[in-house]
Amino acid sequence: MKKTTVLQVCMVFVVCSLQAVIGSPVDCPDQDTAGVSCIISLEKLLERAVQHAELIHHIAEESKLLFDEMLISFGVVNLHISEGTMCSPKTVSVPMSKTEIQQISDKWLLHSVLILVQFWINPLVDVQASLMNYQNAPSALVDRSKLMSTKITSLEQGILVLIRQILGEGGLVVEGPEDTSDHFVSSDTFETVRRDYSVIYCFRKDAHKIQTLLKLLKCRQIDKENCSLF
């Protein structure tokens, strides 16, 4: 109990600190727009998108730890995750060498990030709703599921703005997100828990990919030099 309390206090401090500086990637909190649409520089948009992705990844890691603790309290240890069926079927790989980084385009980076972001929007909404029905779900876990759902939707809006700014109108044909309902439906209580855990378990991995790809995009657009993941 003491360990859980300390963990929750630390998490609240970190999340609140990050939230204090991160709104939506497309907000203009420091400008008096007087009813006119504000204009944010590309550098600022990329900076906010990276910050958003970092926050989302951080919350996903925390959520996984909190879910692990909840499973232990339920007497469940080493819950098996079948990544082939529960994780994103559209694999977006992170470049593994300097040669690969040089070969990929900014369009590929934007498209890959958008695919990952859009894929997880509905599953995260479903997990948020599902956790509300748990009898003993920690409030910290429920709160983080809501925050993940909100932030991933905000990040999608920011990515769409970045696509228009970097590639221009029509520069990337944006398809609707893949229907993931068949991947995450279950009426069995244990399978529901497994499904919810699988979503968080898999999402934190893709959240790290999103963060990595956005950092690379920001470097290529703004810094221009020494853009490497190594």
From Swiss-Prot:
UniProtKB keywords: Disulfide bond, Glycoprotein, Hormone, Secreted, Signal
Q: Which GO terms describe its molecular function?
A: growth hormone activity; growth hormone receptor binding
Glycosylated residues are N226
Write one Pfam family the protein is assigned to.
Hormone_1
Read off the PROSITE patterns from this record. SOMATOTROPIN_2
In Gene Ontology terms, what is a biological process of this protein?
A: response to nutrient levels
**CDD domains (alphabetical):** somatolactin
A single Gene Ontology CC annotation of this entry is: extracellular space
- The answer to keyword Glycoprotein applying to this record is yes
Q: Where is the signal peptide?
A: 1-23
Predominantly, its location class is secreted
Q: Where in the cell is it found?
A: Secreted
List all disulphide bridges recorded for this chain. Answer: C28-C38, C87-C202, C219-C227
Identify its protein family. Belongs to the somatotropin/prolactin family.
- PANTHER family (alphabetical): SOMATOLACTIN ALPHA ISOFORM X1-RELATED, SOMATOTROPIN,PROLACTIN
- UniProt-recorded name of the protein: Somatolactin
Q: Which organism is it from?
A: Carassius auratus (Goldfish)
Organism lineage string: Eukaryota, Metazoa, Chordata, Craniata, Vertebrata
